[in-house]
Amino acid sequence: MITLTHVLGSDIPHHNLTVLRFFNDVLAKCLPVEQVRHFMVAAKETAPFSSFPQLDINTYSDKKALAEAVIARAQADRSARFFWHGQFNVTLWLALLSGKIKPGQVYWHVWGADLYEDAKSLKFRLFYLLRRIAQGRVGHVFATRGDLIHYQQRHPRVPASLLYFPTRMDPALTAINIDKPLAGPMTILVGNSGDTTNRHIEALKAIHQQFGPDVRVIIPMGYPANNEAYIEQVRQAGLALFSQDNLRILTEQIPFDDYLNILRECDLGYFIFNRQQGIGTLCLLTQFGVPFVLSRKNPFWQDLAEQHIPVFFYGDTLDEPMIREAQRQLAGLDKQAIAFFNPNYIEGWKQALALAAGEHP
């Protein structure tokens, strides 16, 4: 049996730990060790990895060191196969483009930012062009329905399969309907992180225009680190629209259970990033019967529609009765059948890893 090496090529602690936890706690119990055990991870902080005894994790101090190790292994053994989980590592894309890594060696699971080209500088525009070419040279691509449609417009000949990120969810909560209070001001969650792709200030202005100053707004901004200047910009913009009592900015990473309690309080989510992003938060809101607003440029709306989940589009007319009706629809939805919920996404991972390991034609 072919041994797969899983590559987490950027130091993104939250996402990387979610993947590692899923492999250690779930997949290691039901799949051959050759498919799930071996990882190469870019990480400065390695202490959390001691919680994953079922995995063999080689760590590298930065993206370049990891890429050099992957390239060396790929060149030394052309039968070696790598499963890339997201890929924000320039050196790896250039290695694939130059032939140092061969297409048949790479199986790639797309993460949100992988396909999108937001930066405007000449340097990034050149990189985007090269990356786009390289992305057409992988052996197989895995992604959400919306991202697959986006990808296959550029690379129709590359084999592709549906696969969802292993969002951390408690399946026991899926069957519980949470009653929303119909009186009092609504609570709205804005964005899924402190990243500028959330367009927080634009979202706050739209919320104020649609619902007035009396709604409560919660903005999670505990990630990324060293983001104080942007957080302060968002705070000042928010205070110009909402009272201090109605504006809550979360500037620290918070425990998972505390985050769930915050999501339960919400009546609406507001996510206007122009790409696939924040699927974990969208899943948790759906689990708790909370509808949300998305940009039409976020292709994940196609996955939501496929699962009959109501969604509002940014820029459309929106009022409180429409939100209450969407909450009613979500309460009546068979959430246990949603493809990207835990445990339903596990079967997709079993199929993906078997395919990457050569167990399927």
UniProtKB/Swiss-Prot annotation:
It comes from Yersinia pestis. GO terms for cellular component: plasma membrane. Its EC number is 2.4.1.325. The keyword Transport does not apply. This is TDP-N-acetylfucosamine:lipid II N-acetylfucosaminyltransferase. Belongs to the glycosyltransferase 56 family. It is a peripheral membrane protein. GO terms for molecular function: 4-acetamido-4,6-dideoxy-D-galactose transferase activity; fucosyltransferase activity. It is an enzyme of class 2 (transferase). It catalyses: beta-D-ManNAcA-(1->4)-alpha-D-GlcNAc-di-trans,octa-cis-undecaprenyl diphosphate + dTDP-4-acetamido-4,6-dideoxy-alpha-D-galactose = alpha-D-FucNAc4-(1->4)-beta-D-ManNAcA-(1->4)-D-GlcNAc-undecaprenyl diphosphate + dTDP + H(+). Its main location: membrane. One of its GO terms (biological process) is fucosylation. It is found in: Cell inner membrane. Keywords: Cell inner membrane, Cell membrane, Glycosyltransferase, Membrane, Transferase. It comes from the Bacteria. Catalyzes the synthesis of Und-PP-GlcNAc-ManNAcA-Fuc4NAc (Lipid III), the third lipid-linked intermediate involved in ECA synthesis. InterPro entries: WecF. The keyword DNA repair does not apply. Pathway: Bacterial outer membrane biogenesis; enterobacterial common antigen biosynthesis.
